[in-house]
Amino acid sequence: MKKISILLSVLILISCANENEIDELTIYTSRQPQLLEPIIEDFNDDTGIKVNLLSGNAQELMERIDIEGNDSMADIFMTVDAGVLWQAAERDIFSKVDSEILERNVPSYLKDPENKWFGLSKRARTIVFSSDQFASDDF
């Protein structure tokens, strides 16, 4: 949890690098809010920055960002899979982030080649099969 909290803090601070002082931050996310709330609470305690979380369907959130344009309240768009990140990049809703911290800590396979998005986590996928029909060597 601490690594995720640190990385989230870095991303948030970098996303607002143009601001001199940050009092409040808005994250549009398709992740489950209950999974983010402990991280956000830690971030708030560590920095004093209030985080507003707007949760919803990824497609709807991207539409909202498109409609809001430059007036979007979203400082960060956080989603659950790389496919949505690709769609968001294609819609050009991301800005390039230049950060030595992210360059050092996020492997190239977990980020956009143009630094428009960075992966926060990765998941293992399992294959379930009938051992009556297949041998594990078949895979």
Walk through the language-model features, giving the residues of each:
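Short, solvent-exposed loop/turn and secondary-structure capping segments
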Residues: 39-40, 89-91, 130
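Residues that line or immediately flank small-molecule/substrate-binding pockets and catalytic motifs
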Residues: 8, 81, 101
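Short, glycine/serine-rich, charged loops/turns that create anion-binding
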Residues: 11, 32, 133
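A structural signal for short loop-to-beta-strand junctions that line the ligand-binding cleft
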Residues: 72-77, 95-132
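Short helix-loop capping/hinge motifs at secondary-structure junctions, enriched
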Residues: 132-139
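Short, low-complexity disordered leader/linker segments with a strong preference
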Residues: 1-24
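Early extracytoplasmic/lumenal segment of secretory-pathway proteins
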Residues: 16-86
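Glycine-rich, phosphate-binding/catalytic loops in enzymes
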Residues: 44-45, 90-97
